[in-house]
Amino acid sequence: MEPQDRTKRPQEEDNGVPIDGHNGSNSEPAAKKIKLDSPSSADSRAKGVAPIKAEYLLFPPGQKAKPTQSEAEADDNDDDAAEGRTAPTPQETQQAPQKDGKRKSQRGQNKEREFGTFSDAQRLCNTIAWTPEFSPRPCKHGDRCNALHDLRKYLKEGRRPDITTFGGKCPVWEKYGKCPSGWRCLFVHSHMDEIKHEDGRSELVLVGDASKAPEGGEEAAGEIKPGVVNMVPVGIKYDLSKKRIPLEKSEQYLAWLAKDTKHLAKHYQKHKDDETNPNDYRAQYVEPPFKPSEKRRLYFGRETPVLAPLTTQGNLPFRRLCVELGAQVTYSEMALGLPLLQGLKADWTLMRAHESEIVPPRFNPGGPIVQGYDNSKDVKFGAQIAANAPWVAVKATEALSQLLPHLRLVDLNCGCPVDAVFKSGSGSALLDSHSKLERMIRGMNAVSGEVPITAKIRMGSRDGKLTAQKLVERLALGSEDLRDMIGAPGCAAVTLHGRTRLQRYTKAADWGYIAECAALIKQFNEKSNDLADTIREADENTLPNGGKMYFLGNGDCYSHVEYFDHVDNAKVDSVMIGRGALVKPWVFEEIEKGQYLDKSSSERLTYIEKFVRYGMEAWGSDELGLNYTRRFLLEFLSFFCRYVPIGLLERLPPNLNERPPAYRGRDDLETLFASKNYKDWIKISEMFLGPAPPGFKFQPKHKSNSYEIEAEG
């Protein structure tokens, strides 16, 4: 369902950029006059094609005016992959193998992506990586150590020369007065010195705080990134892997759950041939060993636009950029529950947040009264996990609640469409397992302490069988067997993506269905209160937010006009924005200001520079950190290139699912940003990160855009 007509909504002017075509002045250039035509004009646009003004088209209308099929396919596959590690294409699932192997190899997704190796030519020993030249720490390997201990040789032969971007000065050291990368920093000459001793010797030293070696060597250095919170020490992760971290609540709850599940199965097996009497089950029912703790109250409202959890692209630097531009709620990338319990570094790294994410979200005290909500204790950052069994979800939730001091909520992913996740029983596989999902939510709620539990779902696992309406009832009230015995499951909020698992991004999100679910949830919230009043006194521990379950919509939101249309007409509490933020991160700023913002190419370049700076702060300014930053910048640019400046459009609002014909920008930089050629993305990265090293590879999520740098010679 397309969003309703937005031309009737009151419009404001944007920084001299009128979004209704009228500002009382003719002094603005034509490119700055943004016009909204009548609905009939908007309907006349070619389906799926962005309406670029004729003067910016590279080809006359009708001649190569539409994006190619491979370009659209690449975009759609990248959109699927933003929710997971891989996703099948229609060709892979419906067609027989092609005889032309070469052509086949260039289609679909890169399911086993490689990014090459990018390390120093010779490794510097940790014992000298942060110390003065003459004062290394003792090396436990002694003469058997195969790393370099000669600092001067390392600086001359063991690594690349310093890069010259940012004036040759280390951005991390310039901001914080220290650089966790130490001698490995590729800007190290900006924070090192050579001092003369009385005996005539010259010693290389790091300047100021950069000379302080972290306890524990390289691993510890990775744990002290400036401005980063929710850092779990290496020792704790090791203890998790050895099952030395007590998860007592989980053990007690899971033991009860196993008995109850067995008892329930036996009851229904006994009565499978006749009508079951629920009173038989209730008579033998044993309550859980403990009640959930009372939860910290949540709040979602029209002033709290939400950044969706995004695999790969939803990394810390990108979230930090979006928060700076107005995002009020953020989520970690989806972490897998079992690797978290195994203490795997990669999944625990996803739980790190920037200090800007642990401040309270925006809250309008003049709005509706939210009983019990304390904005001063709220934070923006939440964690999202995927699990295929109650024991995984419950234990992972208790571990997160124990070990992460800054956590708004724990969200259970029930919508990931990726084959590998689905076949494991996680993600969107839970859309067809309502009973298991309820047990998971109840268990997570029981062990999470004061941290609320939420869920993200889709309309269903396949077209023609939409299950979200039944599922939201289950999440709001619980099954009929349990709702009047132990109350609601305790789900504080549900986010609904307006697509099924099998529906790809060629179709618009169904906001009509989202609106129907929003109306149901309003009824369920009222019914929950009625049940509490008529059956027994309300149990605050099973009624999140005092009985109100928040409902968020997700899908295709790309402007403030669409955002407020969904809040006002679909009646969702807030809107979660995913692809729209990847293409246009300042969509949150537009929502805050209530107007379109025609960002210039220089402003967009500033956002790229900020991403690079934030990447070096998060991952380091050494060879490894710079190329992590480069890799994730290229991932970001694979979406960023889709933005069509609104000054180039004939009509508004812009549509996220429309692809532009070939066009030129208002300047060379704007034209460069519009390129879908990976070589141009590399050029943009080199503006800030210097030339890519010989071992660097970049494989986008679609095979038609791969890059592998070749070593000279």
Swiss-Prot record:
<keyword id="KW-0539">Nucleus</keyword>
<keyword id="KW-0521">NADP</keyword>
<feature type="compositionally biased region" description="Acidic residues">
    <location>
        <begin position="72"/>
        <end position="81"/>
    </location>
</feature>
<dbReference type="InterPro" id="IPR018517">
    <property type="entry name" value="tRNA_hU_synthase_CS"/>
</dbReference>
<feature type="zinc finger region" description="C3H1-type 2">
    <location>
        <begin position="170"/>
        <end position="191"/>
    </location>
</feature>
<keyword id="KW-0479">Metal-binding</keyword>
<feature type="binding site">
    <location>
        <position position="456"/>
    </location>
    <ligand>
        <name>FMN</name>
    </ligand>
</feature>
<dbReference type="GO" id="GO:0102265">
    <property type="term" value="F:tRNA-dihydrouridine47 synthase activity"/>
</dbReference>
<dbReference type="GO" id="GO:0003723">
    <property type="term" value="F:RNA binding"/>
</dbReference>
<feature type="binding site">
    <location>
        <position position="384"/>
    </location>
    <ligand>
        <name>FMN</name>
    </ligand>
</feature>
<dbReference type="GO" id="GO:0006397">
    <property type="term" value="P:mRNA processing"/>
</dbReference>
<comment type="function">
    <text>Catalyzes the synthesis of dihydrouridine, a modified base found in the D-loop of most tRNAs. Specifically modifies U47 in cytoplasmic tRNAs. Catalyzes the synthesis of dihydrouridine in some mRNAs, thereby affecting their translation.</text>
</comment>
<feature type="region of interest" description="Disordered">
    <location>
        <begin position="1"/>
        <end position="117"/>
    </location>
</feature>
<feature type="binding site">
    <location>
        <begin position="309"/>
        <end position="311"/>
    </location>
    <ligand>
        <name>FMN</name>
    </ligand>
</feature>
<dbReference type="InterPro" id="IPR013785">
    <property type="entry name" value="Aldolase_TIM"/>
</dbReference>
<dbReference type="InterPro" id="IPR035587">
    <property type="entry name" value="DUS-like_FMN-bd"/>
</dbReference>
<feature type="compositionally biased region" description="Basic and acidic residues">
    <location>
        <begin position="1"/>
        <end position="12"/>
    </location>
</feature>
<keyword id="KW-0507">mRNA processing</keyword>
<dbReference type="GO" id="GO:0005737">
    <property type="term" value="C:cytoplasm"/>
</dbReference>
<keyword id="KW-0862">Zinc</keyword>
<keyword id="KW-0963">Cytoplasm</keyword>
<dbReference type="GO" id="GO:0106414">
    <property type="term" value="F:mRNA dihydrouridine synthase activity"/>
</dbReference>
<feature type="zinc finger region" description="C3H1-type 1">
    <location>
        <begin position="125"/>
        <end position="149"/>
    </location>
</feature>
<dbReference type="Pfam" id="PF01207">
    <property type="entry name" value="Dus"/>
</dbReference>
<dbReference type="GO" id="GO:0050660">
    <property type="term" value="F:flavin adenine dinucleotide binding"/>
</dbReference>
<keyword id="KW-0288">FMN</keyword>
<dbReference type="GO" id="GO:0008270">
    <property type="term" value="F:zinc ion binding"/>
</dbReference>
<protein>
    <recommendedName>
        <fullName>tRNA-dihydrouridine(47) synthase [NAD(P)(+)]</fullName>
        <ecNumber>1.3.1.89</ecNumber>
        <ecNumber>1.3.1.-</ecNumber>
    </recommendedName>
</protein>
<keyword id="KW-0677">Repeat</keyword>
<feature type="active site" description="Proton donor">
    <location>
        <position position="416"/>
    </location>
</feature>
<comment type="similarity">
    <text>Belongs to the Dus family. Dus3 subfamily.</text>
</comment>
<keyword id="KW-0863">Zinc-finger</keyword>
<keyword id="KW-0520">NAD</keyword>
<feature type="binding site">
    <location>
        <begin position="554"/>
        <end position="556"/>
    </location>
    <ligand>
        <name>FMN</name>
    </ligand>
</feature>
<feature type="binding site">
    <location>
        <position position="497"/>
    </location>
    <ligand>
        <name>FMN</name>
    </ligand>
</feature>
<dbReference type="GO" id="GO:0005634">
    <property type="term" value="C:nucleus"/>
</dbReference>
<feature type="binding site">
    <location>
        <begin position="578"/>
        <end position="579"/>
    </location>
    <ligand>
        <name>FMN</name>
    </ligand>
</feature>
<keyword id="KW-0819">tRNA processing</keyword>
<feature type="compositionally biased region" description="Low complexity">
    <location>
        <begin position="86"/>
        <end position="98"/>
    </location>
</feature>
<keyword id="KW-0285">Flavoprotein</keyword>
<keyword id="KW-0560">Oxidoreductase</keyword>
